[in-house]
Amino acid sequence: MPKNKGKGGKNRRRGKNENESEKRELVFKEDGQEYAQVIKMLGNGRLEAMCFDGVKRLCHIRGKLRKKVWINTSDIILVGLRDYQDNKADVILKYNADEARSLKAYGELPEHAKINETDTFGPGDDDEIQFDDIGDDDEDIDDI
């Protein structure tokens, strides 16, 4: 058999779709849409979300978002309400932490909404790491 001398298959040539770096325009809700927070991931492209109008709904992740946008619990999402089923909705968009904070600042989200803070560092976080000194004696490593 010939030796593998390539750098990978056809997926390498296609490359990754890196669209996280560009900032997108903030999308507000329209009529027939509602903001919601994910309570539980159910699998099979479905999730349980608490809409900010006070109704708990079973949401279906649409095909455009299904494998490209990963949705976790406590994420803020925009859902499209169904006219014929009040307890079901379709996920239209997932907001990242910065967009959710700006929605809260605009007054679109209620004050009690908890935004997941794991995506970005807050203003108080530093890049420095504080180490506790184990020994108080001033021994140099070269002297040992």
Curated annotation (Swiss-Prot):
What region holds the S1-like domain?
22-96
Q: Name one GO molecular function term.
A: RNA binding
- Which residues fall in a compositionally biased region of kind Basic and acidic residues? 16-26
List the Gene3D superfamilies hit by this protein, alphabetically. Nucleic acid-binding proteins
GO BP, sorted A to Z: ribosome assembly; translational initiation
User: What function does the entry list?
Assistant: Component of the 43S pre-initiation complex (43S PIC), which binds to the mRNA cap-proximal region, scans mRNA 5'-untranslated region, and locates the initiation codon. This protein enhances formation of the cap-proximal complex. Together with EIF1, facilitates scanning, start codon recognition, promotion of the assembly of 48S complex at the initiation codon (43S PIC becomes 48S PIC after the start codon is reached), and dissociation of aberrant complexes.
Compositionally skewed regions (Acidic residues) per UniProt: 124-144
Q: Classify the source by domain of life.
A: Eukaryota
- Record key words, sorted: Cytoplasm, Host-virus interaction, Initiation factor, Protein biosynthesis, RNA-binding, tRNA-binding
Q: What is this protein called?
A: Eukaryotic translation initiation factor 1A, X-chromosomal
HAMAP family, A to Z: aIF_1A
**Subunit structure as annotated in this protein's UniProt entry:** Component of the 43S pre-initiation complex (43S PIC), which is composed of the 40S ribosomal subunit, EIF1, eIF1A (EIF1AX), eIF3 complex, EIF5 and eIF2-GTP-initiator tRNA complex (eIF2 ternary complex). Interacts with EIF5; this interaction contributes to the maintenance of EIF1 within the open 43S PIC. Interacts through its C-terminal domain (CTD) with the CTD of EIF5B; from the location of the start codon by the 43S complex until the formation of the 80S complex. (Microbial infection) Interacts with human respiratory syncytial virus (HRSV) nucleoprotein; this interaction recruits EIF1AX to the viral replication complex to facilitate viral genomic RNA synthesis and virus production.
